[in-house]
Design a protein with these regions (language model features):
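Short beta-strand/loop motif that positions the catalytic acidic residue
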Residues: 141, 147-149, 153
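Acidic catalytic loop of the alpha/beta-hydrolase fold
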Residues: 126-127, 151-156, 181
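Flexible "cap/lid" loop of the alpha/beta hydrolase fold
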Residues: 30-31, 38-70, 133
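Short alpha-helix in the alpha/beta-hydrolase fold that links the catalytic acid
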Residues: 133-135, 143, 157-166
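Gly/Ala-rich beta-loop-alpha elbow adjacent to hydrolase catalytic centers
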Residues: 17-21, 25
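Conserved acidic catalytic loop of the alpha/beta-hydrolase fold
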Residues: 1-13
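Conserved alpha/beta-hydrolase catalytic His-Asp/Glu region
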Residues: 50-52, 56, 72-140
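Catalytic active-site module of serine/aspartate enzymes centered on a nucleophile-bearing elbow/loop
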Residues: 169-206
Length: 206
């Protein structure tokens, strides 16, 4: 809200939240519905409690105090698939980020101590596992919404989509075949097309 007020944005805004960002924009929209024109999710966290996954195990370990100090070094790579670097899951999209570009971005962000700390702090203090109540409340509000998810997501299992559709009946959705959690930069043509269509549709309905 502070940023919106500072920028003197009077019209309603369109929000997009990816992974951890899903519950974050969802909470904002839920608390400030008069400021939001649409809320759009990309493989949002929040239903991970419904299923045991590798990421759940890593996140729960962070609740053990003496482990936090040591796991903070490797936490980002664990969340990105359990490797020391990120590898694109597919090369079929000609508009994808190249592997070299991705490696460069990954190495750069890992140089910042605050990056790792922020991820660890978010995992420890923000409920990534279960934000179902928030999604249920948001689903009762008349806010345009959409979600895109990969059916092979290894970080945030795509079966969360069924729960999300139940809690948010009017949400527009797209399930991308064989797409994993890196769909934003591995399959940007699909994600970009879906989001642009949703935002255009929501804007025309204003």
């Amino acid at each position: 809200m502070e940023l919106i007020d500072y920028l003197k944005i009077e019209q309603k805004v369109h929000l997009i939240g990816y992974s951890m960002g899903g519950p974050i924009v969802g909470h904002f929209a839920n608390e400030n519905p008069n400021k939001v024109e649409s809320v759009n999710f990309i493989a949002p966290a929040g239903y991970m409690f419904k299923r045991k996954s590798q990421s759940n195990v890593y996140l729960k370990i962070l609740n053990v105090p003496f482990i936090t100090k040591y796991i903070s070094v490797v936490f980002p790579s664990l969340m990105y698939g359990g490797n020391s670097s990120i590898k694109l899951s597919t090369d079929e999209d000609e508009n994808r980020l190249s592997q070299n570009e991705l490696n460069a971005v990954y190495r750069k962000q890992m140089k910042y101590e605050g990056f790792t700390r922020s991820l660890v702090s978010t995992a420890k203090n923000f409920n990534l596992f279960n934000t179902q109540k928030m999604f249920q409340e948001l689903g009762k509000k008349n806010i345009n919404s959409s979600v895109i998810w990969g059916d092979a997501d290894e970080v945030v299992p795509s079966d969360g989509l069924n729960y999300l559709k139940s809690d948010y009946p009017n949400i527009n959705y797209k399930l991308v075949k064989n797409a994993r959690h890196d769909l934003t930069y591995a399959l940007p043509s699909i994600v970009g097309k879906f989001l642009s269509e949703q935002l255009l549709s929501f804007s025309n309905n204003e």
